[in-house]
């Protein structure tokens, strides 16, 4: 864009405006490009599958590379240069994201299934099958698979079963399985377990007083941790309200106490919005105020009960309570609770090492125990009371992951988090035989399924073939013939399958090779939903890019090979057209490759190179400029417009 150097003398200027366009492609050619992107991502993720899966090294800017066997980490690290290939990869990344969000594990399984369904669907549609019928057949088969998984599922009842699930999800690491089994045993199946970096070579388990609830920060602007989107405070104050907070005056006293004590402040309320939230965010961003607003958990009467538990555990006064008439606007230091540590994410809040007031926590625990002793209580109320009692009495299990280096600790933490998520999923919906065997046991039921049309049957067959892939991939990563293993397992029954670690066929459940039902159900659902849509795609629309034009406009004609030797010769023709003369090269900028003088002069801007106090408006019109510019190779998509310099 060219701007006047003498605004008073020139009332208008011209700019080169890019006429942005879209690249629209049709048919099997663009589908093939997307499938190629799916293949690249799935190949990278699949190598991590099973107990003998390999590791992947991911480059990270400004820090050491990450070594991981976590399929989700690998999937989200991939971005392909080709736009259409990248679209395919991104769609499968969405599958991994959804599976990780819902089940916390199984992203590798979901990716392998998605690739199989997408490729087979693409092949069938290329041969003339109806895309809509194919998708219907796929989703019909998935419903049958989910029903059969539910029938096969067995509830997790013992510590040994929990330990087996954790060990398998941690790629066969028995130490991780033992640690998670012990932690679950101490805080209960639905207790809170968190993972942190350790300070020693060995892993450690600590049980500390604390509780966790399911709501997190109100705004991401409160995040202060470089490791994930979290808020982490030490030695923080806690302010609690049962009512909504909208005005700044409601929280001023609490903020003053926080500043006087030089301690972070956590505000828990039904909702925080308006002037109050704006002021907190603004002060956090501008002044570094250590504060975080959190929405209180649950709803209705249950919310009031949980707020009471938080108050008892931290020693905070509950403002807005019908029993307590204390005003938030008059909050004193003794009205604020205290915690030794707080970890807040977008979905959850964990308050550790609270400092309750004398006798109040014991009274709260006794009150819950008395309610549990009543015989006329409903089953769902009894479950809630047990969860609350566990949170107040058993505390929080903290797993400190040790190692000889940061890379080793991070790799192990990924596996521990996966194992924890798998354990929670198993407790929630039960377990089925592992190693891909549960999917193989669903195939005979799909083969017996009667459909209305041939294309619908093809959709069912696509799922039948895809269900073989998890077992086949695990076997291939173990160095054996995958299809042969699948055939042998299919000839067996129930939990008979292949143990990749021991390289033998056995009863998998007896050997502790099991998968959480929720993980498999989520994986097949997410994979089929996205992959079947991908294979039915007929048109792909992307942003059109003209690399030659971008190179010419940016003056990057000389490339970047020799330091920053950026030649602005690409703009010579434009400069000549506008009467500005040549701008020369940009050599000589220290050791950066040279940015030579901006010679060539600004030819019509005054004698001796100086700027004149006035400038002529004579010159080519916008229409003439358009014709001259479009005559330059690669500049056909550029348009010249007159714009008012007063708007600059």
UniProtKB/Swiss-Prot annotation:
Any single Gene Ontology cellular-component annotation: mitochondrial inner membrane
Keywords associated with the record: ATP-binding, Chaperone, Mitochondrion, Nucleotide-binding, Transit peptide
Primary subcellular site in the record, as a coarse category: mitochondrion
GO molecular function terms listed in the Swiss-Prot or TrEMBL record: ATP binding; ATP hydrolysis activity; ATP-dependent protein folding chaperone; protein-folding chaperone binding
Subcellular location: Mitochondrion matrix
One Pfam family from the record: Cpn60_TCP1
GO biological process, one term: apoptotic mitochondrial changes
UniProt transit peptide range: 1-55
UniProt cross-references to PANTHER family, sorted A to Z: 60 KDA HEAT SHOCK PROTEIN, MITOCHONDRIAL
Function noted in UniProt: Prevents misfolding and promotes the refolding and proper assembly of unfolded polypeptides generated under stress conditions.
Family to which this protein belongs: Belongs to the chaperonin (HSP60) family.
Protein name: 60 kDa heat shock protein homolog 1, mitochondrial
Gene for this chain: Hsp60B
